[in-house]
Amino acid sequence: MGNIRETNIKRTAFSLIENYGEVFTKDFETNKALVTKYTTIESKIIRNRVAGYVTRKVARMKVY
C-alpha cells in the first residue's frame, strides 16, 4: 500500500510540474531547492512532501 497525499500537496505539485516541469529532476535535494524557489511554502514538512511528490511524478513521467 502506498502513501496517500493531501489534496493541497497534490495540487501544488501538479501546478509546479505544469508551470516549471522542465526544471525538475529525479533528485529530491534539487527539487527541494526548486520548490523553495518557486513557492512561498514556509513549512519544512510541507515543502519536503511537495518535493517528494514532484520527484516521484517526474521520475515516472520520464520512464514512459
Curated annotation (Swiss-Prot):
GO biological process: translation
Domain of life: Archaea
InterPro entries: Ribosomal_eS17, Ribosomal_eS17_CS, Ribosomal_eS17_sf
Keyword vocabulary terms for this entry: Ribonucleoprotein, Ribosomal protein
Record-level GO cellular component terms: cytosol; ribonucleoprotein complex; ribosome
Organism annotation: Methanosarcina mazei (strain ATCC BAA-159 / DSM 3647 / Goe1 / Go1 / JCM 11833 / OCM 88) (Methanosarcina frisia)
Entry's family note: Belongs to the eukaryotic ribosomal protein eS17 family.
Protein name in UniProt: Small ribosomal subunit protein eS17
Coiled coil segments of this chain: none
Matches recorded under HAMAP family: Ribosomal_eS17
An MF annotation (GO) of this entry: structural constituent of ribosome
Keyword Ribonucleoprotein listed: yes
Gene3D superfamilies cross-referenced by the UniProt entry: Ribosomal protein S17e-like (1.10.60.20)
One of the Pfam families matching this protein, by short name: Ribosomal_S17e
